[in-house]
């Protein structure tokens, strides 16, 4: 991580990223490990997540810790699933397997609760990956489809399609 910090030109952004690392590094590893069940793969997923976070520092809320954590955990989950898929390319993995892995890695549930505790948040919280992540990034973190595509390592069109399908499911 500290080698990646040297790539950040702005000292304020470098310090912000350092604080994020101090605050969330262990939790990021646990989220990735919960999905991957392998220490080396979890470390790879966290490292890939840091690269995405550094490239998108302007999207991370500096005032709202819950918003920042929501964004970070979404990136970590996405990168961990990408690592899992790369690791298991030979064997087909269905969406139920992914959902089971995500359920196991969810933790205390506070990650996905909005501060107002609205029923819409509860509905979204019950959705499966990737619908839940796209809706949270779009409406809670207020990201554009381009930013969502970058965060989830997918195309803009795919982010739009996922969002559309998710809204229909609501």
PLM region spans:
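DNA-recognition helix of helix-turn-helix
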Residues: 123, 146, 151-170
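Amphipathic, Lys/Arg- and hydrophobic-enriched alpha-helical face
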Residues: 21-40, 56-59, 124
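A short pre-motif secondary-structure segment
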Residues: 134-138
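N-terminal module of bacterial RNA polymerase sigma factors
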Residues: 1-27, 34, 117
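Short, small-hydrophobic-rich alpha-helical interface motif
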Residues: 28, 32, 42-53, 148, ...
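Acidic, proline/glycine-rich intrinsically disordered inter-domain spacer in sigma factors
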Residues: 99-125
């Amino acid at each position: 991580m500290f080698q990646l910090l040297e790539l950040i030109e702005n000292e304020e952004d470098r310090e912000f990223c350092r604080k994020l690392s101090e605050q969330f590094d262990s939790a990021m590893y646990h989220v990735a490990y919960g999905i991957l069940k392998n220490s080396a793969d979890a470390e790879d997923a966290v490292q890939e997540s840091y690269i995405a976070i550094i490239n998108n520092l302007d999207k991370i809320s500096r005032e709202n810790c819950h918003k920042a954590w929501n964004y970070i955990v979404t990136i970590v989950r996405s990168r961990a699933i990408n690592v899992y898929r790369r690791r298991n390319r030979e064997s087909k993995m269905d969406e139920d397997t992914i959902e089971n892995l995500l359920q196991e890695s969810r933790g205390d549930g506070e990650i996905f609760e909005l501060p107002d505790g609205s029923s819409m948040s509860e509905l979204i919280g019950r959705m499966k990956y990737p619908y839940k992540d796209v809706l949270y990034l779009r409406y809670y973190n207020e990201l554009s489809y381009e930013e969502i595509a970058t965060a989830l390592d997918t195309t803009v069109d795919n982010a739009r399609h996922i969002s559309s399908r998710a809204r229909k499911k609501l």
